[in-house]
Amino acid sequence: MCSKYGIFLVILQQNIVYLEMAEITIKDKTFKTSIPEAEILKRIQVVADRINHDMKDKNPLLLAVLNGSFIFAADLMRMLTIPCEISFVKLASYQGTTSTGTIKEVLGINEDLTNRTVIIVEDIVETGLTMKRMIETLGTRNPESIHICSLLVKPERLQ
């Protein structure tokens, strides 16, 4: 069982002034931009720099949780300069835009994780239940260490 864990977070500033708010509609929901893309990319670069430094001799496997982390994982991969690999896992824990509390693996992990450094790449950690399940599942596959890299965290929702 893996005993090493770490967290890389893209921590975004909360006190940003927005001059123009873009809108996007997905299905029947309309969203307004709350964090400018340039700010997100700047913070992803900070995290990539840390991963480049901390993992330089590890050849980590980035395990991106689909669908949400796809763009974040792509941006992060472009900024990494160390040897690394990426793979994808798809879990279902939402019904529409609400977390169900139940996590179902839809697309599993095919890689051998024995003695590998694994970085789980997630877009949003809301309740933490998905991360808990992933760490438990990955830990049974004997990785050297497991780290979490999340774009956003909702601390008030963590369980």
Model region roles, listed by residue range:
Residues 4-159:
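PRPP-associated nucleotide enzymes
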